[in-house]
């Protein structure tokens, strides 16, 4: 039996190379079998792309990454044109192979020790008032990257004392207590960790993750920081039912999560998990009603909603869909 070829540091694996060794194999989609995208998912491009180019240049010149680009987010043009971006720290190579996600897999490079300062300077130069900081999974690091998150929060606040910071963290697999100890030194204004889908779909969609671990991470952070809102996001269209999603919402509330994002899964390439259904705006509205009834303080539910989509407005309690 041939051993898998050893990954070279810094080499990005995408598409078929990325998903070749996941537990549930994916048959590449054929155009004829792919569901037709409904009109409500067609994104209008802004009239001017000048602001988009400016933000991309600011990221490039400082060696920074945005999840907007790395994950091929459909809202990139809208968010960049409004001067907002979700920064992705700890590099652009993930140690996981989630087949719904377009971020590259591989063996990451050592974290950039200068990234926290560069990030803080870029945010100051962009005059941002609210930022979302996320990262790839870093199972290669003993703390899962928690110290780097704390360093970034500290440096951002040094240069931007009035800013609000939301962090969208990985699951810190096997390191929850150590990670939360570190994050307690520099707690964010919003703590976000995405469950992504219902538990019965984890094996195919989130290999290496565990539904209960993720719920425990959210609850244990909340126990340490009762005044910091906790938040989670889900995708629809991976084979789940509306009732399965409703149960996830109940689980989130039982674990003291207050903010919710719920959006439509879109297939990044033919090598990723196929879209099994397009959920109508009316169904998202029904789930929004349920979320409100369950006691979520903020619930953004709609086809194009993503976990950091208009995160500043979500945090202010304004309706986003």
From Swiss-Prot:
Its EC number is 2.8.1.8. HAMAP family: Lipoyl_synth (MF_00206). The keyword Phosphoprotein does not apply. The gene is lipA. This is Lipoyl synthase. SUPFAM superfamilies: Radical SAM enzymes. GO terms for molecular function: 4 iron, 4 sulfur cluster binding; lipoate synthase activity; metal ion binding. Pathway: Protein modification; protein lipoylation via endogenous pathway; protein N(6)-(lipoyl)lysine from octanoyl-[acyl-carrier-protein]: step 2/2. Gene3D superfamilies: Aldolase class I (3.20.20.70). SMART domains: Elp3 (SM00729). Its cofactor is [4Fe-4S] cluster. Binds 2 [4Fe-4S] clusters per subunit. One cluster is coordinated with 3 cysteines and an exchangeable S-adenosyl-L-methionine.
